[in-house]
Every structure is written in C-alpha cells, then in structure tokens.
C-alpha cells in the first residue's frame, strides 16, 4: 500500500507515544511469512495497533504482488533490500516481529506469528 522512502525505520521517531506498533519483518519469498500473514490481517483492525512492515531482501514488485494476493495489513512499509536495517533491529531472518509501545520494544517474536502470539498481542494492547 505505502512504500515509504522518506523516513528511516532505523530510528524510533516514526513510532508515536500513544499507539502500540507491530513491526513485522517479512519477504514475499518466505514461506513462514505466508503462514503468519493471516494473523497480521486479523490484527489490522485493532484500534490502538498500527502494523508496520519491513520488507526484507525482496523486490518491490514481488512484495506488491504478495500483498495483492494475500491482503495488506500494513499502514507503512519500508524496503530493506540489503537486509542491513533488519540486522540493526537485531533480526536474524524472516519473519520476526517486534511489539513497540512508547518507543520501546516490549516483545520480540522470532519466527511466524501464530494463534498463541495473536492472543498474546491482543491481551497486551487492550
């Protein structure tokens, strides 16, 4: 939906103080990313949660097709063609997801989100 070129996801300045943010590192070629995507779509309508995507080592065209085929839960998407931004966040692969509140990481999910992590996120943001 929105591929942001002007801001950097490397700093916390894009995250506001009020909402919770879910920063999801994903790729169109990642099979576990496809498996977790339905859980991101379920979280998309949570009032005080914004989902931000970091597209990892992917082609923009492939990422757009993935989102067209599977739906777009992201309010913002950043491109990380080289993978260096993900490394700066402490991610070692895809998918990885960070729950952020008041500009601090409060939970890190390594691997695909599932029903259990969906329930955990919903409890935290209520």
Language-model segments: which ranges?
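Thiol/disulfide oxidoreductase modules built on the thioredoxin-like
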Residues: 68-73, 80-125
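Conserved redox-active cysteine motifs that mediate thiol-disulfide chemistry
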Residues: 25-42
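Conserved segment of the thioredoxin-like fold in thiol-based oxidoreductases
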Residues: 45-46, 50-82, 94
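A short beta-strand-turn-helix
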Residues: 1-21
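Extracytoplasmic/secreted envelope proteins and their assembly/folding machinery
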Residues: 37, 41, 60-67, 118-122
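Short alpha-helical
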Residues: 31, 58-62, 84, 113-116
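Hydrophobic beta-strand anchors of alpha/beta hydrolase catalytic cores
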Residues: 22-23, 51, 97
């Amino acid at each position: 939906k929105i591929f942001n070129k002007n801001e950097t996801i490397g700093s916390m300045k894009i995250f506001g103080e009020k909402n919770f943010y879910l920063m999801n590192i994903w790729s169109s070629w990642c099979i576990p990313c496809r498996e977790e995507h339905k859980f991101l779509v379920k979280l998309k309508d949570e009032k005080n949660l914004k989902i931000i995507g970091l597209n990892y080592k992917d082609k923009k065209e492939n990422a757009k097709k993935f989102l067209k085929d599977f739906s777009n839960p992201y309010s913002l998407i950043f491109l990380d063609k080289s993978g260096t931004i993900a490394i700066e966040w402490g991610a070692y692969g895809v998918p990885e997801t960070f729950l952020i509140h008041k500009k601090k990481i409060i939970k890190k999910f390594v691997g695909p989100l599932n029903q259990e992590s969906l329930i955990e996120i919903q409890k935290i943001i209520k």
